[in-house]
């Protein structure tokens, strides 16, 4: 019941966002998007810590390298200094491309979480669903933003996700689940950083304050 109530509130918030955002300024839209991306990154960090609490001893050795994340093919700024040099249109395109690239992986994580061999799989499953909700909410908000910014900001890179199975044994499932979450946490940080730079520009803040 609590989960349903929470989901209802979020969906109402999304509906209000879609209905009202067309009537508010771009800087306010940037602020709302930044708040949602911050929550997305915070949730992914919390999930990663949950997984760390029950990780196989050899997990760190066996887990794929970050370069194996399916979004690694997308060229993105490496830090804030580089992001500050990128145009608004490119930053919003990168944020939307990364967000869209995680639709299918989040579906996989959501389906695997309830039976994950982890003592906190119930909490993990709940947080994954929250990630999906906030990802959808953020995506809807960014769609409204690009409509205000014009056609040149609407380009999205297609990033295929080929993984559809976390493995059969317990160790493989834990490691691959953790790997995907680590990739998502990295990308959620990028999305949050890009949107904060956009927010700074919209509010004319000094670069060092971003």
UniProtKB/Swiss-Prot annotation:
Keyword entries, A-Z: Disulfide bond, Hormone, Secreted, Signal
Instruction: Give one Pfam family.
Output: Hormone_1
Respond yes or no to whether keyword Secreted is given for this record.
yes
Alphabetized InterPro entries for the sequence: 4_helix_cytokine-like_core, Somatotropin/Prolactin, Somatotropin_CS
Q: Which GO terms describe its biological process?
A: cell surface receptor signaling pathway via JAK-STAT; negative regulation of gene expression; positive regulation of gene expression; positive regulation of leukocyte proliferation; positive regulation of phagocytosis; positive regulation of reactive oxygen species biosynthetic process; positive regulation of receptor signaling pathway via JAK-STAT; positive regulation of respiratory burst
Q: Name one GO cellular component term.
A: extracellular space
Say if the entry is tagged with keyword Transport: no
Where does the protein end up?
Secreted
Q: Which GO terms describe its molecular function?
A: hormone activity; prolactin receptor binding; superoxide-generating NADPH oxidase activator activity
Main localization is secreted
Coiled-coil-forming residues are none
Give the residue range of the signal peptide. 1-23
Protein family (similarity comment): Belongs to the somatotropin/prolactin family.
Q: What is this protein called?
A: Prolactin
What organism is this sequence from? Oncorhynchus mykiss
Q: What is the primary gene name for this protein?
A: prl
């Amino acid at each position: 019941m609590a989960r349903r109530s929470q989901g209802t509130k979020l969906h109402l918030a999304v509906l209000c966002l879609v209905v009202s955002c067309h009537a508010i300024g771009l800087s306010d839209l940037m602020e709302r998007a930044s708040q949602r991306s911050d929550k997305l990154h915070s949730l992914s960090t919390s999930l990663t810590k949950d997984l760390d609490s029950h990780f196989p001893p050899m997990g760190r050795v066996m887990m794929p390298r970050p370069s194996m994340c399916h979004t690694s093919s997308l060229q993105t700024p490496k830090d804030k200094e580089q992001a500050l040099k990128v145009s608004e249109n490119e930053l919003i395109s990168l944020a939307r491309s990364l967000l869209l690239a995680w639709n299918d992986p989040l579906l996989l994580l959501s389906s695997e979480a309830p039976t994950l061999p982890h003592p906190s799989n119930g909490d993990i499953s709940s947080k994954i669903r929250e990630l999906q909700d906030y990802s959808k909410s953020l995506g809807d908000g960014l769609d409204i933003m690009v409509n205000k910014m014009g056609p040149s900001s609407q380009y999205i890179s297609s990033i295929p996700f080929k993984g559809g199975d976390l493995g059969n044994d317990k160790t493989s499932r834990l490691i691959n689940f953790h790997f995907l979450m680590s990739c998502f946490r990295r990308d959620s940080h990028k999305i949050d950083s890009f949107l904060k730079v956009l927010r700074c520009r919209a509010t004319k803040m000094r670069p060092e304050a971003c």
